[in-house]
Amino acid sequence: MSSSKIAVLYGSETGNAQDFAAILSHKLNRLHFKHTFSSLADYKREDILRCRYLFIVCSTTGQGELPRNVYETVTGDQKNTLWTFLKKKKLPADFLNHIKTAFLGLGDSSYPKFNYALRIIHNRMVNQLGAKEIFDRMEADEQSMAGSNKGTGLGIESVYFEFEKRIITYLMDRFPTRKVGNEIIQREEIDKELYLEPITYLRIDDPHDQQSFSGGPTTFVGDKLIKTGTITLNKRITAKDHFQDVRQFTFESCDDIKYKPGDTVALYSYNTDQSVERMLECQPQWIPLADKPLSFTNGIPTHLLDGGVVQPLTLRNLLKYHCDFMSIPRSSFFLKIWTFATDVTRMERGEEQMKDQRQKLYEFATDEDMQELYDYCNRPRRSILEVMEDFLSIRLPLEYLLDFFPPIKPRLYSISSTANCNNIELTVAIVKYKTILRKIRTGVCTDFISKLKVGDKIRYKIQQNDLIKEEYRSNPFVMVGPGVGLAPLLSAVRSKVSPEMSLYFGCRFKDKDYLHGKELEDMANQGLIKFYPVFSRDRENSPDTKYVQDVLWKFGEEVTNLLVERKGIFFLCGASGKMPIQIRLTLLEMLKKWGGFKDDASAKEYLRSMEKEYRYIQETW
């Protein structure tokens, strides 16, 4: 069976869907099922005609939108993708009837459009183009309150492993044997001790060559969409004694740019030199080769193209600019590295300790409930680097570096500045906290941002989200944004998206984290906006309200009139989890009390109609 007959495709914004798809791909490889593994956007659309078995894992982002790598390739092409092709109206209703398929959606039921992206893809492929499902679509919920794990208390991984089990059982039932040369043999799993070499990997051009690149300038090639900005302001706007450092971060674009309120900036950060040195110390066999020129055996891996590939291509530069070893490892990381726990020379207890480490890494890779992995990695927020420091028996071949470590992905930040202004302003909360291990943790990108100085350069892209529709610019806007959720709303009020804007902002203290408070009060005094701040830990300045939903309820009759009678736009931004759920519940009660809706069902239906009309906008993270 050729690799074009089976495809494992993913649509992933944060990496979860991609990781589960990678685990499935790994399992299929070990069973000798040749297949294509790719994002939906980077899958060659002509291959869909040869494909017979298609497995899709997809998450949902934003307002029930498709992840970007469903409709845009790593090089920024949106015209020649599979999804663009499948949306063509002229395609016949039986266009995909040659394909057997299965779908897994990863979602969070606290969002209004739970697993909406996968449902869009499923509807088009199955209901409209005739693909045949092997089994019913599966949907996993982070909250365990909806989808395939509703009420079970089990996480999304339980749904994934059931999805995987059904696919492998299906394929093994139909293809129990395989052809090797002229012989038909039983299909059996490859020895778990054997590492599966990736299609393309690194090659040391000449390890004995005296040429090396150390400390010289770097450039990036292969991504024409990347832009460069110059830092003009990096100012803390919370009090020094406040627990959170929030920055007013501004950079001037070197190019003419266009963006609207609700659009985001993708920033390309990199690891510190100190963390790179720590990684090299974990793998001392790499040190003599760290600055030697490298090349690829079979072309540049697709995932490196976003942002461009660093030049000169050396191990040190790859670790600094491309390898996200400061991230929390996913189970696919352990699947690939456990077999390389072979170095007994650094074990105090010798071979016995090495075997213990090897066994523990294998358990992290294969444990289906993932509880041990969660306790070891996720709860203490342990990084890949720290895993490598804990398990010194790991001795990784340099050649497969990019198969072991995930790529550093750009981080997305909502724009705060006025539309199309060449001075792009962001409102960034610096991630820094202590874990249960009492260790300080920092975010790779926000730590990078916190250290930038005026005059430094930064690499970025603008991502246009089209959250605010032009036809609604005359409608009233009701905007809710606790904390740094203010960022896109600040862009909206500065850009005057509507002649009638109400802004509900929440923070802890008026004198500590009242972000852009004076500017917003000045706008309110000038009659440009109605501004309703609330301070959850400051009873002196907020005596009768605590959270933004309390202020919404206080002015509930007015807000309901704006949303129902005057077809207003509701724009909610901030942290995902409890906040958006509480806001939505408050709106439902307001609609029943002041909007003329007699029960939950009719109020919920009105909110759904607002979503369909793009009048209910939720941007949470």
Curated annotation (Swiss-Prot):
Gene Ontology molecular functions: flavin adenine dinucleotide binding; FMN binding; NADP binding; NADPH-hemoprotein reductase activity
Organism: Candida glabrata (strain ATCC 2001 / BCRC 20586 / JCM 3761 / NBRC 0622 / NRRL Y-65 / CBS 138)
Disulfide bonds: none
One Pfam family here: FAD_binding_1
Residues noted as binding FMN in the record, renumbered to the chain: 12-17, 59-62, 106-115, 142
Quaternary structure, from the entry: Interacts with DRE2; as part of the cytosolic iron-sulfur (Fe-S) protein assembly (CIA) machinery.
Keyword tags: Cytoplasm, FAD, Flavoprotein, FMN, Mitochondrion, NADP, Oxidoreductase
Phylogenetic classification of the source organism: Eukaryota, Fungi, Dikarya, Ascomycota, Saccharomycotina
Binding residues for NADP(+): 536-537, 545-549
Enzyme nomenclature, EC number: 1.18.1.-
Function (record text): NADPH-dependent reductase which is a central component of the cytosolic iron-sulfur (Fe-S) protein assembly (CIA) machinery. Transfers electrons from NADPH via its FAD and FMN prosthetic groups to the [2Fe-2S] cluster of DRE2, another key component of the CIA machinery. In turn, this reduced cluster provides electrons for assembly of cytosolic iron-sulfur cluster proteins. Positively controls H(2)O(2)-induced cell death.
PROSITE patterns recorded: FAD_FR, FLAVODOXIN_LIKE
Required cofactor names: FAD; FMN
Positions in coiled-coil regions: none
Protein name, UniProt field: NADPH-dependent diflavin oxidoreductase 1
GO cellular component terms given for this protein: cytosolic [4Fe-4S] assembly targeting complex; mitochondrion
Superkingdom of source: Eukaryota
Keyword Flavoprotein: yes
Residues that, per the record, bind FAD: 381, 411-414, 443-446, 621
Annotated localization: Cytoplasm; Mitochondrion
Family: Belongs to the NADPH-dependent diflavin oxidoreductase NDOR1 family.
Domain FAD-binding FR-type as annotated: residue spans: 224-489
GO biological process: cellular response to oxidative stress; iron-sulfur cluster assembly; nitric oxide biosynthetic process; positive regulation of nitric oxide biosynthetic process
Domain (Flavodoxin-like): residue spans on this chain: 6-168
InterPro entries linked: CysJ-like_FAD-binding, FAD-bd_FR_type, Flavdoxin-like, Flavodoxin/NO_synth, Flavoprot_Pyr_Nucl_cyt_Rdtase, Flavoprotein-like_sf, FNR_nucleotide-bd, NADPH_Cyt_P450_Rdtase_alpha
Keyword Flavoprotein appears in the UniProt entry: yes
